């Protein structure tokens, strides 16, 4: 866009169209009256100043729209911005873009910072040498310039410490003539200038905040920041050395053994481990060996062998697990063996009812006297096999039917056994169950 030939480029200025008639194609005012160059320049000065202000305002409006879009701000809320605000926002945005580019360059190539710092130090030394050789320069200007260069060099050192790319980065970065990572400044020490611009990192004391040591400093953009020193690579202090035969070594060995015993609790005895057994763990049947062959578990004629289910899954509830454990211990005792010979409970191969069933059964015990029925014709199985108990009405009815079929073969008195089975089924069906 040609700002020189466009008078009405900005709405803020009321430029009349009368001025455009006296201008030629090249944008300069013609001389119809034969005025001199001085008079013509004096006549053209207000018009050129108005054009210059129009160009500035037009560029500021363009810059305002661009910076609001870049900073993701609503233009409707920032309709009236001063020229200084627009310029400040532009400077901050360009500084942030520059920092982002520097970070990207550092991530892609860590040696970029080293190269930049080396070149900056060389240029700063050349400027300092040139200023010191020139005559007629004020001492205050020379001091402020040297202090500013020192501050910039220290800012570059802070960037190198924050990048944290190599271990020996701060030690061997500059040549022998340049500044090093030591507290010595880039140039010889100079007194404080009038504007106090020589505030560097070495002069700033460390502060404690929240248990952390922070160093106040300034970023290259001029912003104030608190930097945490790099202590991540520091190794922990070694512990005190103790000879193996000394008392300290024995105490250290005892302490390590105690810690190992706490961390690895495999040395617990059987008494302690018995209390750690969960209620959901399945008890081990001690009446039958675990490695008993199948050919040794035989049954007598007229006796049906029930299938054995080796399952590692937990029982349905802790109550059934505890009750089955108690029933196994009762079945393994000799008193229960003697009682099973003189009762109808030894005739049936199904396991006894659970504790919940017996508690709600109003008929009492099912054991009869030895004179009412003789079960000598049917002997109990060789091994008591554990079965998982299912507390449901259908499972109880199924066990009653199986018991009725088996008792028909083993019973000596057929009518009495059927009568007993009918009574047991009637009592079990009439019993109230919570489920």
UniProtKB/Swiss-Prot annotation:
Residues 355-378, 385-395 have a biased composition (Polar residues). Residues 18-48, 305-334, 349-416 are annotated as: Disordered. GO terms for biological process: adult locomotory behavior; larval locomotory behavior; negative regulation of gene expression; negative regulation of transcription by RNA polymerase II; neuroblast development; positive regulation of mitotic nuclear division; positive regulation of neuroblast proliferation; R7 cell fate commitment. Residues 18-27, 311-324 have a biased composition (Low complexity). Gene3D superfamilies: 6.10.250.980, Helix-loop-helix DNA-binding domain (4.10.280.10). InterPro entries: bHLH_dom (IPR011598), HES_HEY (IPR050370), HLH_DNA-bd_sf (IPR036638), Orange_dom (IPR003650). Has a particular type of basic domain (presence of a helix-interrupting proline) that binds to the N-box (CACNAG), rather than the canonical E-box (CANNTG). Residues 116-149 form the Orange domain. The modification Phosphoserine is found at residues 407-408, 411. It is found in: Nucleus. Disruption phenotype: Lethal at different developmental stages. In late third instar larval brains, results in a complete absence of type II neuroblasts (NBs) and a reduction of type I NBs; after larval hatching, loss of neuroblasts in the ventral nerve cord and specific loss of type I neuroblasts within 48 hours; in the pupae, results in a premature loss of mushroom body NBs. Escaper adult flies display weak motor activity, lethargic behavior, and shortened life span. RNAi-mediated knockdown of the protein in type II neuroblasts lineage results in an increase in the number of type II neuroblasts. It comes from Drosophila melanogaster (Fruit fly). This is Protein deadpan. A motif (WRPW motif) lies at residues 432-435. PANTHER family: BASIC HELIX-LOOP-HELIX TRANSCRIPTION FACTOR, HES-RELATED. Transcriptional repressor of genes that require a bHLH protein for their transcription. In the larval brain, required to maintain the self-renewal and identity of type II neuroblasts by regulating the expression of the transcriptional repressor erm together with other self-renewal transcriptional repressors such as klu and E(spl)mgamma-HLH. As part of its role in neuroblasts development, has been shown to be a direct target of the Notch signaling pathway, however might work also independently of N/Notch. In the developing larval and pupal brain, required for mushroom body differentiation. Homodimer. Heterodimer with E(spl)mgamma-HLH and E(spl). Transcription repression requires formation of a complex with the corepressor protein Groucho. Interacts (via bHLH motif) with sisA. Interacts with da. Residues 40-97 form the bHLH domain. Pfam families: Hairy_orange, HLH. Its main location: nucleus. One of its GO terms (cellular component) is nucleus. Keywords: Developmental protein, Differentiation, DNA-binding, Neurogenesis, Nucleus, Phosphoprotein, Repressor, Transcription, Transcription regulation.
């Amino acid at each position: 866009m040609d700002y020189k030939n466009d008078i009405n480029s900005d709405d803020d200025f009321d430029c009349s169209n009368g001025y455009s008639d006296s201008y030629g194609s090249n944008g300069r005012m013609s001389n119809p009256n034969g005025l001199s160059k001085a008079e013509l320049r004096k006549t053209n000065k207000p018009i050129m100043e108005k054009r210059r202000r129009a160009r500035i305002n037009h560029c500021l409006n363009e810059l305002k729209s661009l910076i609001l879009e870049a900073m993701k701000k609503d233009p409707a809320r920032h309709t009236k911005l001063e020229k200084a605000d627009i310029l400040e926002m532009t400077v901050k945005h360009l500084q942030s873009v520059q920092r982002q580019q520097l970070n990207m360059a550092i991530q892609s190539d860590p040696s970029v910072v080293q190269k930049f710092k080396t070149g900056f130090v060389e240029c700063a030394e050349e400027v300092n040498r040139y200023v010191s050789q020139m005559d007629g320069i004020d001492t205050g200007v020379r001091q402020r310039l040297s202090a500013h260069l020192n501050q910039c060099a220290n800012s570059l050192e802070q960037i190198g410490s924050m990048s944290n790319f190599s271990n020996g980065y701060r030690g061997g970065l500059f040549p022998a003539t340049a500044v090093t990572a030591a507290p010595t400044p880039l140039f010889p020490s100079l007194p404080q200038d009038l504007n106090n611009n020589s505030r560097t990192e070495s002069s700033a004391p460390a502060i404690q905040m929240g248990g952390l040591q922070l160093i106040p400093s300034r970023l290259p953009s001029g912003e104030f920041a608190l930097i945490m020193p790099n202590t991540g690579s520091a190794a922990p202090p070694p512990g005190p050395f103790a000879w193996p035969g000394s008392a300290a070594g024995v105490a250290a060995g005892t302490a390590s053994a105690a810690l190992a015993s706490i961390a690895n609790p495999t040395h617990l005895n059987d008494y302690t481990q018995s209390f750690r057994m969960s209620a959901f763990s399945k008890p081990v049947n001690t009446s039958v060996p675990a490695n008993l062959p199948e050919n040794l578990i035989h049954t007598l004629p007229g006796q049906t062998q029930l299938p054995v289910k080796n399952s590692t899954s937990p029982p349905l509830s802790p109550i059934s697990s505890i009750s089955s454990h108690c029933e196994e211990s009762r079945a393994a005792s000799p008193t229960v063996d003697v009682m099973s010979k003189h009762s109808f409970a030894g005739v049936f191969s199904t396991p006894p009812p659970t504790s919940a069933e017996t508690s709600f059964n109003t008929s009492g015990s099912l054991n009869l006297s030895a004179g009412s029925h003789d079960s000598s014709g049917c002997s109990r199985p060789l091994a008591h096999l554990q079965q998982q108990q299912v507390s449901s009405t259908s499972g109880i009815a199924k066990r009653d039917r199986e018991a009725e079929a088996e008792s028909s073969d083993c019973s000596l008195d057929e009518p009495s056994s059927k009568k007993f089975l009918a009574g047991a089924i009637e009592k079990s069906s009439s019993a109230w169950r919570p489920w």
